[in-house]
Swiss-Prot record:
It comes from the Bacteria. It is found in: Cell inner membrane. High affinity, high specificity proton-dependent sulfate transporter, which mediates sulfate uptake. Provides the sulfur source for the cysteine synthesis pathway. Does not transport thiosulfate. Keywords: Amino-acid biosynthesis, Cell inner membrane, Cell membrane, Cysteine biosynthesis, Membrane, Sulfate transport, Transmembrane, Transmembrane helix, Transport. Residues 1-30, 96-150, 243-253 are cytoplasmic. It is a multi-pass membrane protein. It comes from Escherichia coli (strain K12). This is Sulfate transporter CysZ. Inhibited by sulfite. Its main location: membrane.
Length: 253
């Protein structure tokens, strides 16, 4: 099936919505099952545990609020909850993506072939197994780029005043960009585009990618919906690749 997508610029919101449509297409659903199972098991268990701990963590986080900001505690408390959800959600979605990376790459490859009519390289379970070391190396590159920046932002949470006001906003923007990188990287990596070159390409459409990443980040925090977000985001990012980046970076056509 040749894609009905056009090369006209679209918003990140559009591609996120496309992900929900594409994930259930005939011929694609079977490639969704394994990433979906990984996400349901890990994110479901993780968020269940998180909600049993919030009544301990939130008061601890609020204890860093200085006395002169106590009058804003009714506004800062929701920000503290959102902060915990953002950090926790991104952390566990990163773990889930590490585990499911080979299957996410296969999903992106098969969806791209369906959208464009192109013939992908010969794949299958043996092809996936052979590619696992390269895929894990790529995941490590993303993690090594992300970790020092995340540590700096996490330190901000322990600075009175800043940690309860500015830090949550900065973390949300950072997680939006990182999730755009995480999911857009699957189709890029399928075409062996280097990690640095991929980031440069995404910056040419930074607003679109920030919109896509922001919605992905928000849905990662919502119980039940976050169980399905991984394959949806892979499909949305692949649709964006087909429209915006494939003509310049594709290795197979």
């Amino acid at each position: 099936m040749v894609s009905s997508f056009t090369s006209a610029p679209r918003s990140g919101f559009y591609y996120f919505a496309q992900g929900w449509k594409l994930v259930s297409q005939p011929g694609i659903r079977r490639f969704v099952i394994l990433p979906l199972l990984v996400n349901i098991l890990l994110m479901g268990g993780a968020f269940w545990w998180l909600f049993t701990q919030l009544d301990v963590w939130i008061p601890t986080l609020m204890s860093y609020v200085p006395d002169w900001l106590q009058w804003l505690s009714y506004l800062l408390w929701p920000l503290a909850v959102i902060s915990v959800l953002l950090v926790f959600g991104y952390f566990f979605s990163t773990i889930a993506n590490w585990i499911a990376a080979p299957f996410n790459g296969l999903l992106a490859e098969q969806l791209e072939a369906r959208l464009t009519g192109a013939t992908p390289p010969d794949t299958g379970i043996f092809g996936i197994m052979k590619d696992v070391p390269r895929i894990m190396k790529r995941e490590w590159q993303k993690f090594a780029w992300y970790l020092p920046r995340a540590i700096v932002l996490l330190i901000l949470y322990f600075i009175p005043g800043i940690g309860q006001t500015v830090a949550p906003v900065l973390w949300f923007l950072f997680s939006a960009w990182m999730l755009a990188i995480q999911y857009c990287d699957y189709p890029f990596d399928n075409h062996k585009v280097p990690f640095k070159e991929m980031r440069t390409a995404l910056r040419t459409r930074k607003i679109t990618n920030m919109q896509f990443g922001a919605l992905t980040s928000l849905f990662t925090m919502i119980p039940l919906l976050n169980l399905f977000i991984m394959p949806v985001a892979v499909c949305g990012a692949t649709a964006m690749w087909v429209d915006c980046y494939r003509d310049k970076h594709a290795m197979w056509r």
